[in-house]
Regions:
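Catalytic core of soluble alpha/beta enzymes
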Residues: 153-294, 298, 317-328
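Active-site donor-binding loop signature of nucleotide-sugar glycosyltransferases
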Residues: 47, 206, 311
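N-terminal capping/lid subdomain adjacent to the active-site entrance of alpha/beta enzymes
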Residues: 1-176, 181-183, 187-190, 195-197, ...
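Structural signal for conserved beta-strand scaffold positions within catalytic alpha/beta enzyme cores
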Residues: 121, 255, 310-311
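Short helix/strand-capping turn motifs
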Residues: 304-315
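A short pocket-lining beta-strand/turn micro-motif at the edge of beta-sheets
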Residues: 69-76, 252, 277-283, 305-307
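Short, solvent-exposed coil/turn elements at secondary-structure transition points
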Residues: 8-11, 125, 233, 287, ...
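Oxidoreductase and adenylate-handling cofactor-binding alpha/beta cores
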Residues: 298-304
Length: 349
């Protein structure tokens, strides 16, 4: 088996603003595996590094990928347990290869075009007018669950936007989720959660910055809005530490981003530990291209989730791949008759 990797720079159609930063471009990496006797058949995965957020974000990232490929090509061991994005990409590539090199790492009724996954619409941060327009567009497109990024602009402006949406669409017509990306502080979080709670909010992800277990545990116990852990899961690789954190903080839910929380094997372990403690979960993509998004969507669909999932649609980028993923209203599906179209990629062994 041969292995190679390449870099690819994804370009946003419009700046994507979170409470952490404004994104114009995102660098990602792909890894490919194949049998030298038949190089036309290959498995591919996305090592979806998220600069500034991934636990394996480091200056020598490309050197690590190069070392991994050299080791695999010479049948030498290489420990990738601490490199979540690389683990995510390699797991995808190997499963793709094992399942026929057809970009179906998790074959199911979803990849046969028989089932779809309901997703939420994501409203990025912006001015009040921008966020209102984005919300209206998502609702008009058929979304019955919206997630708002909050914490990046004036809180009172955000509150007014969400209040306007809620007045127009009652809870039985629209579910509203929030994602603070850790933008609140232990001092102001509870006041903000109480003010938001009157708007019938489904949940809020990561209200305060990760690593503050005491503050987060107190919020989870006392918040009028169910609290979900998101960034808190990043970099927690030890199984005992995962169990201890979930027990100590006791969130309502956890948000699973396979490229950030240990690949598919790591995300599965998180699910097992959460369910053992009565904690809910749903899956969210993390700005992957359609290579990574396709794998996440297939993995998610195979678990038959009942809640809307936080999966992207690949529409953020000007230079994404053409894939069989299809969006109909708020249902993400897969067209098995459609073909992948790859740009020219420069692979390094």
């Amino acid at each position: 088996m041969q292995t190679a990797f390449c870099r690819y720079d994804l370009r946003f159609k419009a700046p994507a603003k979170t409470s952490r930063e404004t994104l114009h471009e995102k660098t990602t990496y792909y890894i490919k595996v194949w049998d030298p006797s038949d190089p036309s058949r290959f498995g591919i995965g996305e090592c979806a590094l998220f600069r500034g957020l991934s636990a394996d974000d480091r200056e020598d990232y490309e050197d690590i990928l190069a070392t991994l490929c050299r080791r695999l090509n010479s049948s030498e061991p290489f420990d990738i347990s601490r490199f979540s994005s690389i683990k995510f990409g390699l797991e995808t590539a190997l499963l793709d290869y094992e399942n026929g090199c057809c970009r179906t790492p998790f074959p199911s009724a979803f990849t046969e075009g028989k089932e779809s996954v309901r997703i939420n619409g994501l409203v990025w941060m912006g001015t009040a007018d921008e966020m209102t327009l984005r919300a209206d567009e998502k609702i008009a497109a058929g979304f019955r669950c919206l997630k708002f990024k909050v914490g990046g602009v004036d809180f009172n402006d955000e509150l007014r936007i969400i209040d306007r949406i809620r007045c127009q669409y009652p809870p039985e017509k629209l579910e509203i989720r929030l994602d603070a990306n850790g933008a609140f502080t232990p001092d102001n979080a509870m006041d903000r959660l109480r003010r938001l709670a009157v708007l019938d909010i489904h949940s809020i992800e990561q209200p305060v910055r990760q690593g503050q277990w005491d503050a987060m545990a107190w919020l989870c116990e006392n918040s009028p809005i169910p609290v979900a852990l998101d960034e808190e899961l990043i970099g927690v690789d030890d199984p005992d530490e995962r169990r201890r954190m979930l027990y100590y903080i006791s969130p309502s839910d956890i948000i699973l981003k396979p490229s950030l929380c240990g690949g598919f094997s790591g995300a599965t372990d998180w699910i097992d530990r959460a369910e053992a403690q009565g904690i809910g979960w749903w899956v969210t993509s993390a700005l992957e291209s359609d290579i990574g998004l396709n794998a996440i969507a297939q993995w998610t669909a195979a678990m038959h989730p009942s809640l809307p999932q936080g999966l992207g649609t690949g529409a953020l980028y000007t230079n994404n791949f053409t894939s069989p993923l299809r969006l109909h209203g708020d249902m993400l599906g897969f067209d098995p008759a459609a073909e992948w179209v790859f740009p020219r990629l420069q692979w390094s062994l």
